[in-house]
Amino acid sequence: MKTTDKIIIIDLEATCWQGDVPKGQQNEIIEIGLAVLDSQTGVITKNQGILVKPQRSTVSPFCTELTTITQDLLDKNGVSFEEAIEQLTDEYQPDLYTWVSYGQYDLNMLKKQCRSFGVPYPMGDEHINVKVWFAEKFGLQKPTGMNGALHLLNIPLEGTHHRGVDDAKNIAKILDWCLHN
């Protein structure tokens, strides 16, 4: 592991639709949820969500139902993807730390969107898939979703599921269990 004192947790939310992606649109990051876990103490030292204004898609009613994020919220409070990555880099220096996500989606989506927008990929090479690690540590036959892992650990879901800011904090709790069991 690249770092042992703190680990960055990332959970992305992206535009989505019920069924196929509409013509002329593409899945795009609309929230970068972040948490920082002190791996020794288990304390979540930072937790925030960076709202990202989509440039190549719009938030569908299905997406709002899933995430609670509206197009209006992003229009008023979102920043461009480039600004979001700059904020992430300036505030967290993520290339210096091990980072985790729950599943491979966040890693793949972040790399894909950075390539698509011509933005340097901000994360370090050390990535841990907590979904797979938790399944191995807990002795599961196959990985379970974040909600399922929290349930197995008797940890209540905090906040709103499918909000990056809240999911990052919940993933940090699962990661802490993995680190100490």
Predicted regions and their residues:
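Non-catalytic, well-ordered alpha-helical scaffold segments
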Residues: 86, 107-108, 128-131, 169-172
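Short hydrophobic/aromatic-enriched beta-strand-loop microsegments
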Residues: 120-128
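Active-site catalytic pocket residues across diverse enzymes, especially alpha/beta-hydrolases
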Residues: 114-117, 178-179
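A structural motif
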Residues: 119, 139-151
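Acidic two-metal-ion nuclease catalytic site recognized across multiple nuclease folds
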Residues: 1-2, 150-152, 168-181
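Active-site flanking residues adjacent to catalytic metal/cofactor-binding acidic residues
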Residues: 10, 128, 166
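Conserved non-catalytic scaffold segment of RNase H-like nuclease domains
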Residues: 2-115, 124, 147, 151-162
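Short alpha-helix plus adjacent loop in nuclease-associated cores
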Residues: 128-143
